[in-house]
């Protein structure tokens, strides 16, 4: 389904397909925890956690959290744009002030800048994801439409869990 909606780049389509598989387990949406063990549910909190000057204990931690921000924002803007659209009206929350597309693109760029040693081979993929972020969002919107047409059980579970948080 993903390859059909994102046919231009097989590696990007495979990455996004794996992202959807990973997020089948809703707990994976919120896998990032702060140093106290608190689950981070907002991109604003994740951005603070990823900053090596503030919370991130290492550049490895910065990369880990930034990669999650990328995936999280891409997933939500692509599969649940109606949820993202409600964020500004949800009161005094960090995420009411954050542009998910900009945060996702910036984080993919940062992850793509980690291009040494073990990350040398995957860095170009993350740079392409940054460049093609909106295209990927559109592709995921089309996947969402396909899933809704099928009344896919997992899509309905994701949707229920998001709006119940």
Residue spans of the language-model regions?
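Helix-rich, well-folded core regions that mediate interactions or catalysis
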Residues: 156, 160, 164-165
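Long, non-catalytic protein-protein interaction scaffolds
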Residues: 1-137, 142-144
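Intrinsic, low-complexity terminal and presequence regions
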Residues: 138-141, 149-156
